[in-house]
């Protein structure tokens, strides 16, 4: 497949995120190969690093205790659990992100 055809999603991203566009148009849902291509575009020669968290690293343990509430979390742990740092997929695929937010994932 021609390189220019594969670059179309990046071109669209550049057009919608250029100066003079509205804030809503600048933020995009970027998933899969579109996210990787956008990172290559934003990071350039610096490159980027992404290490997906294992599911067990972000889930709560299934231990039950009489002190735990309905959600299985101790009352003082709930706030800490909600502060888990979002990864790039959560930030840019599940939600929308800007090119400036993508730069946070560059080396």
Swiss-Prot record:
Q: Name one Pfam family in it.
A: Insulin
Any signal peptide, and if so, which residues? Answer: 1-24
A single Gene Ontology molecular function, please?
Answer: hormone activity
Where does this protein chiefly localize? secreted
**Alphabetized InterPro entries for the sequence:** Insulin, Insulin-like, Insulin-like_sf, Insulin_CS, Insulin_family
Note the superkingdom of the native organism.
Eukaryota
The UniProt keyword set, sorted, is: Carbohydrate metabolism, Cleavage on pair of basic residues, Disulfide bond, Glucose metabolism, Hormone, Secreted, Signal
Q: Name one GO cellular component term.
A: extracellular space
What transmembrane ranges does the database entry give?
Answer: none
Which positions are cleaved off as the propeptide during maturation? 57-84
Q: Choose any GO biological process term that the UniProt entry carries and state it.
A: neural retina development
Q: Does the keyword Transmembrane apply?
A: no
Q: Which Cys pairs does UniProt list as disulfide-bonded? A: 31-93, 43-106, 92-97
Localization per record: Secreted
Family of this protein = Belongs to the insulin family.
Quote the function comment for this protein: Insulin decreases blood glucose concentration. It increases cell permeability to monosaccharides, amino acids and fatty acids. It accelerates glycolysis, the pentose phosphate cycle, and glycogen synthesis in liver.
Q: How does it assemble?
A: Heterodimer of a B chain and an A chain linked by two disulfide bonds.
The protein's name? Insulin
* Organism encoding this protein: Gallus gallus (Chicken)
């Amino acid at each position: 497949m021609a390189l220019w055809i594969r670059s179309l999603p990046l071109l669209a991203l550049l057009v919608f995120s250029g100066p003079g566009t509205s804030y809503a148009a600048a933020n995009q849902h970027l998933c899969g190969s579109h996210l990787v291509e956008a990172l290559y575009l934003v990071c350039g020669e610096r490159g980027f690093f992404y290490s997906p968290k294992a599911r067990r690293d972000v889930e709560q343990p299934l231990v039950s205790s009489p002190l735990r509430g309905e959600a299985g979390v101790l009352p003082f742990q709930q706030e800490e659990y909600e502060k888990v740092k979002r990864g790039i997929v959560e930030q840019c695929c599940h939600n929308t992100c800007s090119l400036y937010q993508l730069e946070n994932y560059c080396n």
